From Swiss-Prot:
Belongs to the SNW family. One of its GO terms (biological process) is egg-laying behavior. Pfam families: SKIP_SNW. GO terms for cellular component: spliceosomal complex. Residues 22-34, 376-393, 511-535 have a biased composition (Basic and acidic residues). Residues 179-342 are annotated as: SNW. This is Uncharacterized protein T27F2.1. PANTHER family: NUCLEAR PROTEIN SKIP-RELATED. Residues 1-58, 211-254, 313-353, 376-416, 421-440, 508-535 are annotated as: Disordered.
């Protein structure tokens, strides 16, 4: 028979507004008629018909306790089972609180420890307002703190004293407890019993401190046998084959490093004892992917490095070719300058050679004259006269010789002696200064017969631009100057020399040294003595 929760619960004293609001929710509609899993599904048989009834689960007890007329072990609501109690998952016994109301939050406590706090009420969801005057949140006063501290100290001292006393080999006698007075009233109230009530003084019996212990409390009690192991289902035994025997064969332990007995063990036995062949080596495929990725990255890096190196070599080759071109151009320019300088040097060398030959000839002549003058003085005078002779003059036949140096005698115009006219003859004006009335030998002279180059001789070389070239060039300035001195301006005054800066201060050092040498009393006395001697 099934019961509804509404029939079991008592009538509510006051309707809760929050509960009424929840029940008005459409989710609760039509759920009151559904059977609840928390209700008891069956009831115990009525009294007098429980001969063969054995209560096993919580549902057999209903909402009551144990049945004293049934002499079997009964655990109503799991009482007495402790940790071994077993609760069904879908069945839960009804529990009532101190106020007589059914505890519906028992469903939320399934699977949790009994001491765990489970918030299953609507008030637990709301924020709790604390009052400052509430006793639950007030700090304890000083008296309460002192009392708690004293109780804690006494408890700790008791524990420590008991530990110390148990460790001592001989203990002193325990202090006896104070006597207790008990009022005793006998159960038989008759005249033979004497007084109706009596006072009994109860005193603790004194113990002998040297008495050995009566009971062995240090003996270890064996544990109870544990629960039997769970049964393991085995397959039927089979006959061992040779392959199974070889698989289960464990080789002896043979060391790869030590052989104190000196046994000769085969290499296959050592490898079998090593156990390396029993392990299956599994190589991850990511290693191959990593190796391929590294190889591709290395190849690309090498290609990039090679490309960069080729580009650098090409740039270096271009720079080298440009530098070689510049050097070749500079070398060609230097060769041209050197060839020009060599031509100038050759011309200068030719002039120098000519001058050296002239100088050498003159030295030979001087040496010859000196030798002749030393040996034959008369011949030296004759040679001296010949040296003064003008051999460069052109001798023209039919013309008078006007060179007085050649004859050594002065020549006069004989026609002057035949005329009587002079300065006072009135042949010329007073303003004119011309002692001669006509040019002497003006018709023909030696200078007219001297060769002079004609003006138009270089027309075939320079053309008609010779006059322009002469006008553009300065007659008294060289066409080409020295390198580095062409832009210098001509100074108006004498030559001025520039004084270099004294970087190391040598001039000041020399002046200071000279002043030191000149200074002193001895120097002044010597100077005065010299002046006195000069005077």
């Amino acid at each position: 028979m099934s019961m509804k929760l509404r029939d079991i619960l008592p009538a509510p004293v006051a309707a809760d507004e929050a509960a009424s609001q929840i029940r008005r929710d459409p989710w609760f509609g039509g759920r009151d008629n559904e059977p609840s899993a928390a209700l008891v599904s069956k009831e115990p048989p009525p009294y007098g018909k429980r001969t063969s009834f054995r209560p096993r689960g919580p549902e057999d007890f209903g909402d009551g306790g144990a049945f004293p007329e049934i002499h079997v072990a009964q655990f109503p609501l799991g009482l007495g089972l402790g940790d071994m109690r077993g609760k069904p998952e879908n069945t839960l016994a009804l529990q009532y609180g101190t106020d007589g109301k059914l505890q519906h939050d028992a469903i939320a406590r399934i699977g949790h420890v009994k001491d765990k706090v489970v918030y299953s009420k609507l008030n637990d969801m709301k924020a709790k307002t604390w009052n400052e005057d509430d006793d639950d949140i007030q700090k304890p006063d000083d008296d309460a703190v002192i009392d708690a501290t004293e109780k804690t100290r006494m408890a700790l001292e008791k524990i420590v004293n008991s530990k110390v006393a148990s460790a001592l080999p001989v203990r002193h006698a325990d202090k006896l407890a104070p006597a207790q007075y008990i009022r005793y009233t006998p159960s038989q109230q008759n005249g033979a019993a004497g007084s109706q009530q009596r006072i009994i003084r109860m005193v603790e019996e004194q113990k002998d401190p040297m008495e050995p212990p009566k009971f062995k409390i240090n003996q270890k009690i064996p544990r109870a046998p544990p629960s039997p192991p769970a049964p393991v289902m085995h397959s039927p035994p089979r006959k061992m084959t040779a392959k199974d025997q070889n698989d289960w064969k464990i080789p002896p332990c043979i060391s790869n490093w030590k052989n104190p007995k000196g046994f000769t063990v085969g290499l296959d036995k050592r490898l079998a004892a090593d156990g390396r062949g029993l392990q299956q080596t599994h190589i991850n495929e990511n290693f191959a992917k990593l190796a391929d990725a590294l190889y591709i990255a290395d190849r690309k890096a090498r290609e990039e490095v090679e490309t960069r190196a080729q580009l650098e070599r090409r740039v270096a080759q271009n720079k080298k070719s440009e530098q070689e071109a510049k050097m070749a151009e500079a070398a060609a320019k230097a060769r041209q300058e050197r060839s020009a300088m060599r031509r100038k040097d050759d011309e200068d060398d030719e002039q120098v050679k000519v001058r050296e030959e002239i100088r050498r000839d003159r030295l030979d002549d001087i040496r010859k004259e000196r030798n002749i003058a030393r040996s034959r003085p008369d011949k030296a005078d004759k040679l001296r006269k010949e040296r003064e002779r003008d051999i460069s003059e052109k001798i023209v036949l039919g013309l008078p010789d006007t060179n007085q140096k050649r004859t050594g005698e002065p020549q006069f115009d004989q026609r002057l002696f035949d005329k009587t006219q002079g300065l006072d003859s009135g042949a010329m004006d007073d303003d004119t200064y011309n002692p001669y009335d006509a040019a002497w030998r003006g018709g023909d002279s030696v200078q007219q017969h001297v060769y002079r180059p004609s003006k138009n001789l270089d027309n075939d070389v320079y053309g008609g631009d010779l006059d322009k070239i002469i006008e553009q060039k300065n007659r008294f300035v060289a066409d080409k100057g020295f390198s580095g001195a062409e832009g210098s301006s001509r100074g108006s005054g004498p030559v001025q020399f520039e004084k270099d800066q004294d970087v190391f201060g040598l001039s000041s050092l020399f002046e200071h040294t000279k002043e030191k040498k000149r200074g002193g009393d001895g120097g002044d006395s010597r100077g005065e003595s010299k002046r006195s001697r000069r005077d």
